[in-house]
Swiss-Prot record:
Keywords associated with the record: Coiled coil, Cytoplasm, Meiosis
Transmembrane segments: none
Organism: Schizosaccharomyces pombe (strain 972 / ATCC 24843)
Gene Ontology cellular component terms for the protein in this record: cell division site; cell tip; cytoplasm
Location relative to the cell: Cytoplasm
Residue stretches in coiled coil: 92-177
Name of the protein in its database record: Meiotically up-regulated protein PB17E12.09
Function comment: Has a role in meiosis and sporulation.
Length: 203
């Protein structure tokens, strides 16, 4: 039984070797010297391809980027197919934005805390010079804090103004449509009145 199994597998191996011969043995077995010369030229020009040889942008575009160790919300895929224009997006953009917002929040909290400490220092000190210095520092902090809040308020006001402008344009557009519809209805009524008058006169 074992001899039969080995024989069958040996025949399969021999058959596959005859169908797909080894490249080197195939070229070496060719009697035509032209084939051998072409093979020598090809092997001389072959060199190892390093990762640095691939353009960085192409690497980003041609590979699917999925890191199983990061937050699933940050996972992104970059796919490139023929005829499709896909833009690579940095998977850490949202994380960085979150860090920036958190830094701003902590910075404002720190400034508020410093202002509170300065208020306590002003009330606790008896030295007029230190008291004036503390007050001045407190004013600068409060001015900076209010400036941050003002900038946010101004940004919200700009967005609100843009929204109002868009709503106004939409209202004007709707008014034009309604006016046009009313004019069409008035013309239809006018034509119907003319037809009725004509029928009355004919009688």
């Amino acid at each position: 039984m074992q001899d039969r199994f080995l024989k069958e597998n040996t025949e399969i191996i021999n058959l596959s070797s005859s169908i797909h011969p080894n490249r080197d043995s195939y070229l070496d077995s060719q009697s035509d010297p032209l084939n051998q010369n072409l093979y020598n030229i090809e092997t001389e020009n072959v060199k190892d391809l390093n990762i640095e040889d691939v353009d960085y942008y192409e690497k980003l575009q041609n590979f699917k980027i999925v890191d199983e160790n990061i937050d699933p919300g940050l996972r992104t895929y970059s796919k490139r197919s023929v005829g499709v224009n896909n833009t690579f997006q940095n998977p850490c953009n949202r994380k960085i934005e979150g860090y920036i917002k958190e830094i701003e929040r902590l910075s404002n909290s720190n400034k508020n805390l410093q202002a509170a400490v300065l208020q306590m220092a002003v009330s606790d000190t008896d030295d007029p010079r230190l008291k004036e210095e503390y007050k001045q520092t407190e004013k600068e902090l409060l001015r900076e804090i209010s400036g941050n809040h003002k900038s946010k308020i101004l940004k919200l006001e700009e967005e609100l103004n843009d929204l109002k402008h868009s709503m106004k344009e939409m209202q004007l557009y709707m008014t034009k449509i309604i006016d046009k519809a009313m004019n069409n209805a008035s013309l239809e009524n006018l034509f119907s009145l003319d037809e009725n008058n004509t029928k009355i006169h004919d009688k």
